[in-house]
Amino acid sequence: MGPVLRWITAGESHGRALVAVLEGMVAGVEITSTDISEQLARRRLGYGRGARMSFERDAVSVLSGVRHGLTLGGPIAVEIGNTEWPKWETVMATDPVDPAQLADSARNAPLTRPRPGHADYAGMLKYGFDDARPVLERASARETAARVAAGTIARSFLRQALGVEVLSHVIAIGPSAPYEGPPPGPGDLPAIDASPVRAYDEAAEQAMIAEIEAAKKDGDTLGGVVEVVALGLPVGLGSFTSGDNRLDGQLAAAVMGIQAIKGVEIGDGFATARRRGSQAHDEMYPGPDGVVRSTNRAGGLEGGMTNGQPLRVRAAMKPISTVPRALATVDMATGDEAVAIHQRSDVCAVPAAGVVVEAMVALVLARATLQKFGGDSLAETRRNIDAYRRAVAEREAPAARGTA
């Protein structure tokens, strides 16, 4: 048997639709197409987004695995229609098309000048394509809409099974000074989503907007850093027993698998490497209900397991590789020097990246929860969680009393 919870996406950027399939979700989780649409609308947010976000509406259809707003326990398939499909149905048709029709289509012009930083070059060589179109269609960040759809189901499960909330905020765009204050809570999410750059701090927001404006004026693009916070996790998701069971490794792999993400850190991450051990770890003290800590430098993970503290995951997104002023490249058809192709793109997609990272973190946490607690229905999973929490409380009882 494979992993207890699996997901896969299908579809191209300008194809008929994107599809997400989530297998292994328990029965009884409340989820609707409206829930998914709301999360997809959050993905379209952000200052610096391109023209596509102004008309793409992400028409959601739940095809299977849900009945009357409740999951059934079988594979869940979600389709997200592409608004522009009528313009592309000849160029992106799955069945053969009359070559004369394709020859008359400007949209079918060969794309032979790969963009530095994109999948174009390696994809053309790896798969034997003379044209970058088949590469960029699947490599496009448009695919992340399907991940957000699957992640919406995962976050609903986490909320209903554990009371866990997953949220994100942008902490830096380009060279703007990163936000280093306390992380936001669930009540802060509406204000974050109302921010043009999904920033928690107003001063940081203004600096980020200024960076985007400057890049847009210069015909350039920007990356940045987002932080995802998960609140309410129990102790013990993940394991120390082998590398592939460590939750930090699973989270890093899932987040690094998002288009344009080039770095991941848990908690204070790289800053911890510059500290002495006495200043790097989160000391523990007896408290009213068990062990308490005054810091969370580890970001909620120790030894590959959740430790009951808020989970903090940061992801670094590189600048978008479709640069308006075009970078130097080689025309793969002629071998001549050239400038890279320019497809319609964003100046900055960091605010949207936070929503995508939320989705991937939620999927990994949902999988870890099901691996730990099992169950075929939400009610059964909850019973298992309740029993585990009682057992943990008993083990923590000496610390709760302040005794050895």
Curated annotation (Swiss-Prot):
Binding, FMN? R138, A139, S140, Q259, A260, G303, K318, P319, I320, S321, T322, R344
Documented EC number(s): 4.2.3.5
Reactions listed under catalytic activity:
5-O-(1-carboxyvinyl)-3-phosphoshikimate = chorismate + phosphate
Q: What PROSITE patterns does this protein map onto? A: CHORISMATE_SYNTHASE_1, CHORISMATE_SYNTHASE_2, CHORISMATE_SYNTHASE_3
* Entry-linked InterPro entries: Chorismate_synth (IPR000453), Chorismate_synth_AroC_sf (IPR035904), Chorismate_synthase_CS (IPR020541)
Top EC class per UniProt? lyase
One of the record's GO cellular component terms: cytosol
Identify the domain of life: Bacteria
Whether Amino-acid biosynthesis counts among this entry's keywords is yes
For activity, the cofactor(s) needed are:
FMNH2
| Biological process (GO), any one | chorismate biosynthetic process
Q: Which terms are listed as keywords in the entry?
A: Amino-acid biosynthesis, Aromatic amino acid biosynthesis, FAD, Flavoprotein, FMN, Lyase, NADP
What are this entry's molecular-function GO terms?
A: chorismate synthase activity; FMN binding
What is annotated about its quaternary structure and interactions?
Homotetramer.
HAMAP family per the UniProt record, alphabetical: Chorismate_synth
What does the function comment of this entry state? This reaction introduces a second double bond into the aromatic ring system.
Q: What is this protein called?
A: Chorismate synthase
